[in-house]
Amino acid sequence: MAFSVVLHPAFLLAVLSLRASRSEVLEEPLPLTPEIHKVSFQLKLQEVNLEWTVPALTHEELNMIFQIEISRLNISNTIWVENYSTTVKREEAVRWNWTSDIPLECVKHFIRIRALVDDTKSLPQSSWGNWSSWKEVNAKVSVEPDKSLIFPKDKVLEEGSNVTICLMYGQNVYNVSCKLQDEPIHGEQLDSHVSLLKLNNVVFLSDTGTNINCQATKGPKRIFGTVLFVSKVLEEPKNVSCETRDFKTLDCSWEPGVDTTLTWRKQRFQNYTLCESFSKRCEVSNYRNSYTWQITEGSQEMYNFTLTAENQLRKRSVNINFNLTHRVHPKAPQDVTLKIIGATKANMTWKVHSHGNNYTLLCQVKLQYGEVIHEHNVSVHMSANYLFSDLDPDTKYKAFVRCASANHFWKWSDWTQKEFSTPETAPSQALDVWRQVWSENGRRIVTLFWKPLLKSQANGKIISYNIVVENEAKPTESEHYCVWAPALSTNLSLDLQPYKIRITTNNSMGASPESLMVLSNDSGHEEVKEKTIKGIKDAFNISWEPVSGDTMGYVVDWCAHSQDQRCDLQWKNLGPNTTSTTITSDDFKPGVRYNFRIFERSVEHKARLVEKQRGYTQELAPLVNPKVEIPYSTPNSFVLRWPDYDSDFQAGFIKGYLVYVKSKEMQCNQPWERTLLPDNSVLCKYDINGSETKTLTVENLQPESLYEFFVTPYTSAGPGPNETFTKVTTPDARSHMLLQIILPMTLCVLLSIIVCYWKSQWVKEKCYPDIPNPYKSSILSLIKSKKNPHLIMNVKDCIPDVLEVINKAEGSKTQCVGSGKLHIEDVPTKPPIVPTEKDSSGPVPCIFFENFTYDQSAFDSGSHGLIPGPLKDTAHQLGLLAPPNKFQNVLKNDYMKPLVESPTEETSLIYVSQLASPMCGDKDTLATEPPVPVHGSEYKRQMVVPGSLASPSLKEDNSLTSTVLLGQGEQ
């Protein structure tokens, strides 16, 4: 009983367990095998289209997973496996597409499918179902033995994609080679008559396509090929925006990106479609970058747009959503007017496009003149106005206005512009004036300078400048000058009196306030110290010591250093408590010296020079070397001079000069330094410290030696330019000493010649007169002073013993004397009369003349000439030229007189040319007896003739000589 009780439950459990196991086996779904109904392909797209169904489907809908396997060439060469999930409906075909990477025309493909249930409505399936049978995809074409084919034809693809080109050629064609444009490409052999060319990451070369050309090296050599149309990659639209200007339309715009159009109609420009999700409206744009969307009145405020770009290869989309009231872009203001109020004000009015009284716009007003802009904001419903104030007279202005939504700012409207001009008014500012004064011929030349007024100060076109010059000593008298614009300076010539100068400027509406300047007596003659300053890059730091506390301010003026007193003067006005300033100017240049003057201006408007300063913003090395001359040289030295070198007009302050000397010996004595040039040549250098020393004596040299020298100045920036050396040779020592002797002697001789030439007349009269005069002969006086006075001719001490006087009796024949002969009547028949002892106590010294140029017969009215001849006989042979009877007549008539009784006796001596022809009164005689040239007598030294020689015999053949024998006692 008990056992049965225990056994019965155990049996029941076993039966239940067996039932449960059997029910599980029975409830697991049977595997479903798909059945392929249709396999098609699209060769242009290289696409395989597959359709299949699932028989014995127990549910209306069932989620299933299909595994698709594709093989190429044969079923064992699997190239593609893909799982495809979809919902399968009873008695409805499932479709699937596959794109081949190899043209379908080149090779066969095989496809099969198996399924797996993946749905909660059915018990899960633990494994894949059975495979369907294989389906062949055969689009392969046949090729003739001598031909070749290439696929795909005119392929369209995107830049950066990959493509495989298939070559098919007949059995008679071998070794086919291909080129992409001009670049060769290599392929792989698929079978004996099919080759594949794989191109990766193709690039865009042209919208007309990229050519691929092929040719066989064996068999028919016909060229064949295809064209790849590579398109730019389609981009999604950028910066998509929509706005309204009148709440009637929405203007949507975007940036389309690159153009993907291809030629030959392979691909047109991408299309753009605008779809709004709330209204379910879609519109295709006729433009590539914009579309105008019509707003339905009162329809909606919120918009959600999708903009889609599409071409043959792909689609790109972008979304935008907004509130209409937040995208308001107002139209430009209209009816803008301007009213000029005086010279400094203008009122502008305008209107806006109405959006209702509850809609407020914010308008921006802009005033522009030149580069200056002023902006103001105004709230507007329908119309508004704005008053411009503080305008400049005689100025052209541009007024602008634009508006935007005041509640939700989106964009400003376009500007509306209006131009206007303000009228002129009198200048409002006095001129900034200054002066430059210098002396010339006892007067002052004053150059007045003034700076032009700013446009805001001139208040119109400046016409002229009026200058009034008032002499403080004569205040009622003044001079007026007018200088026409645009001149900014003028010159005045004033005396040394103090003056007041008043300057104003005028435009068409009046004159400016006057500027006053006072010139004191010493203006232009101030002597102050000058110091050197160093500038910085484009500026100078100027400082000075205040002179007095009673000052109205300071003026610093400056200009570039030049030899001309007139320069482009600049100045700067400073306050009374200022003792330093920085002067900057774009005109400052390196290597140019600038002179600064600091003036103190008193309350009386007088300017007093306080200090002078000079400097460079940057010193440069000298640009020019001095021209050196050698004024003097010796065997052991020579002198170098460069006096004409102006050190004040160089590119820097001249600190000194460097003198280089080189020779063969190259021995440098102190203070010379031995130095090297860049070309490694050795020379001696001497540093002349200071710019004023412009002379140097080079000493300790060798005679007759060649030296080379070179002189260059230097500044803080360095020495001057390198130039060629000048050669000099020292002279010989002996020739130099000889020159020292000869030169003074030559100078003395030249001086003597000059003095003699200067006193030539005096020397001639004293030493060798043209007409010797014994009474004026200084030689005689010299002899007289040194010798016995009895040996010197003294007329008053000589008494003539015998005189020959030739008289010309009227009616008688003129006596003529030939050369060396006498006429018959003149030949003495008696011996000449000779003084005897009875007449004289002893020998009487007499003067003997051999010069026949003087004749004492001047006292006779019948004057005549004597024919001189050479004196061949000695003194003791000479006789009287006159016969005794004539001599007695002379004595009787008192023809002989003391020579010293009358001064006229000196002048009564008749000069007869020593070369004169015979003087004859008979023409016949002249004809028959031509004159014979005679030797010219000369004035010879007088001598004392002894008494024993007083009466020599006269021979006929002797030449005639005029002889005078004077007795000692004759007065």
From Swiss-Prot:
Sequence ranges on the Extracellular membrane side: 24-737
Keywords: Disulfide bond, Glycoprotein, Membrane, Receptor, Repeat, Signal, Transmembrane, Transmembrane helix
GO cellular component terms, semicolon-separated: external side of plasma membrane; plasma membrane
Annotated localization: Membrane
Positions of transmembrane segments: 738-758
One function term, GO molecular function aspect: oncostatin-M receptor activity
Ranges in the topological domain labelled Cytoplasmic: 759-971
Region ranges (Disordered): 949-971
SMART domains reported in the protein's UniProt record: FN3 (SM00060)
Any GO BP: cell surface receptor signaling pathway
UniProt main location, coarse: membrane
Induction profile: Up-regulated by IL31 in dorsal root ganglia.
Biased composition annotated in UniProt, kind: Polar residues: 959-971
Tissue expression from the record: Widely expressed. Expressed at highest levels in the lung, heart, thymus and spleen. Expressed in dorsal root ganglia.
Keyword Repeat recorded: yes
Pfam families: fn3, LIF-R_Ig-like, LIFR_D2
InterPro entries tied to this protein: FN3_dom, FN3_sf, Hematopoietin_rcpt_Gp130_CS, Ig-like_fold, LIF-R-like_Ig-like, LIFR_D2, Type1_Cytokine_Rcpt_Type2
Glycosylated position list: 74, 97, 130, 162, 239, 271, 304, 323, 377, 491, 541, 577, 689, 722
Cysteines engaged in disulfide bonds, as pairs: 242-252
Membrane topology: Single-pass type I membrane protein
Coiled coil segments of this chain: none
Ranges spanned by the short sequence motif WSXWS motif, renumbered to the chain: 412-416
PANTHER family: INTERLEUKIN-27 RECEPTOR SUBUNIT ALPHA
Entry domain remark: The WSXWS motif appears to be necessary for proper protein folding and thereby efficient intracellular transport and cell-surface receptor binding. The box 1 motif is required for JAK interaction and/or activation.
Family note: Belongs to the type I cytokine receptor family. Type 2 subfamily.
Protein name: Oncostatin-M-specific receptor subunit beta
Source organism of the structure: Mus musculus (Mouse)
Native organism taxonomy: Eukaryota, Metazoa, Chordata, Craniata, Vertebrata
